[in-house]
């Protein structure tokens, strides 16, 4: 199991080079030679869309999206079966969010990963998830296939979350307003 954190800057040691950040889990958990570790670091950088030339830079020299790619590369270093991604795109611009989400989905398929994707943005959750668990007050209150959660939620809190999603279509606005008022 590995982790991808919400804030890529605070989760990366600012005094370490990118290559050392990605290599650290390999130093701790593998018996690879130095050459093999360096080759794997370069391979991981390539997998997340960064170049091996960037390995000798520090985290502050990268954008938020690039730093998140470094965090993703670090999480893949030990070839985990499961990655816990805690709000991995919430601190990023919308255009960068899409790139990171698509990268994670590609890596999930390529490496046969299970990703526990923790998020508040239901549009992101719907896009990336096969199954969704809904938490309320620290308790898992509903878990189901993504389509079932969105089409036929069973828990009241899940229903309330789905009703809170902004709807760009103004034609149904009055109906949704009546529905919200009938709950209260």
Predicted regions and their residues:
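Conserved ABC ATPase "signature" region
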Residues: 35-53, 162-163
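Conserved ABC ATPase signature
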Residues: 58-62, 66
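Hydrophobic anchor residue at the start of the ABC signature
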Residues: 72, 100
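A short, surface-exposed alpha-helical micro-motif characterized by mixed small hydrophobic
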Residues: 125-127
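Short catalytic/signature loops enriched in Gly
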Residues: 145-184
